């Protein structure tokens, strides 16, 4: 099972992906869902107008790990491969960026007119106005894994080492922050006036929340804690796991209490 949509975050239905690839990231923009994959042969992206029926598209065969939408275009970054970033104005036809040369891309987000990509090697950050021309930025060194934007703040979290968090109001100047635990932070999102992050391992609770992107508080999720991704929509936070038994989805309205899903 590689795709499952839900109209409410509680009831899920298995759907067929466009290809049997390892789909690592999905985003939505301009009426289209777009997903990217590090595997496959010539078909490492797919798109859907409804989240149910998916169609392959054909970007370069890099190890695509993250995609986002902003400024009228989709932009993706790769962990490895000849092409490190690509962009598309329609989510179907992709153009390579020759400007970004950094390897080990992990995540990309968009906010305040800027795409921000983070890298696990050397703790690098790179920014772009259009997904094509990129500029490297100086930041605290970290094993950066995930990024989000909300309420005038970029937030980036790390999977190991210190610092485990950093923030920036403009994507250019970054400040190290303290996470709630030395956890392997996998995903962060913004919604309901707060940032919410999840992790798959760690020394403390595997969920944390921040109301300003700088100060973090622990929250307790449900059991079977191998949380890999979290997102927000329609008033609900939804986190998903890659375990094959137990709690694979958990939901929360305000992050104070989580409920088990699938």
What would you call each of these model-derived segments?
Residues 1-262:
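Residue-level hotspots at or immediately adjacent to binding/recognition sites across diverse folds
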């Amino acid at each position: 099972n590689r795709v499952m949509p839900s109209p409410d975050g509680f009831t899920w239905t298995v759907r067929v992906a466009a290809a049997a690839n390892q789909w690592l990231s999905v985003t939505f923009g301009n009426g289209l869902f777009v997903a990217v994959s590090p595997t496959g042969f010539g078909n490492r992206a797919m798109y859907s107008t409804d989240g149910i029926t998916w169609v392959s598209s054909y970007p370069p065969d890099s190890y695509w790990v993250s995609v986002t939408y902003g400024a009228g275009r989709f932009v993706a970054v790769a962990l490895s491969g000849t092409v490190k970033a690509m962009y598309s104005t329609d989510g179907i036809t992709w153009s390579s960026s020759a400007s970004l040369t950094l390897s080990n891309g992990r995540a990309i987000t968009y906010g305040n007119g800027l795409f921000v990509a983070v890298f696990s090697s050397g703790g690098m950050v790179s920014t772009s106005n259009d997904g094509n021309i990129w500029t490297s930025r100086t930041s605290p060194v970290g094993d950066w894994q995930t990024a989000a934007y909300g309420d005038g703040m970029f937030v980036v979290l790390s999977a190991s080492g210190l610092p485990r968090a950093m923030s920036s109001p403009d994507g250019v100047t970054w400040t190290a922050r303290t996470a709630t635990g030395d956890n392997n932070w996998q995903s962060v999102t913004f919604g309901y006036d707060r940032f919410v992050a999840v992790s798959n391992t760690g020394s403390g609770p595997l969920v944390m929340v921040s109301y300003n992107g700088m100060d973090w508080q622990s929250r307790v999720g449900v059991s079977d804690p191998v949380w890999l991704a979290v997102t927000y929509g329609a008033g609900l936070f939804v986190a998903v796991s890659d375990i094959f038994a137990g709690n694979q989805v958990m939901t929360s309205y305000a992050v104070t209490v989580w409920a088990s899903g699938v």
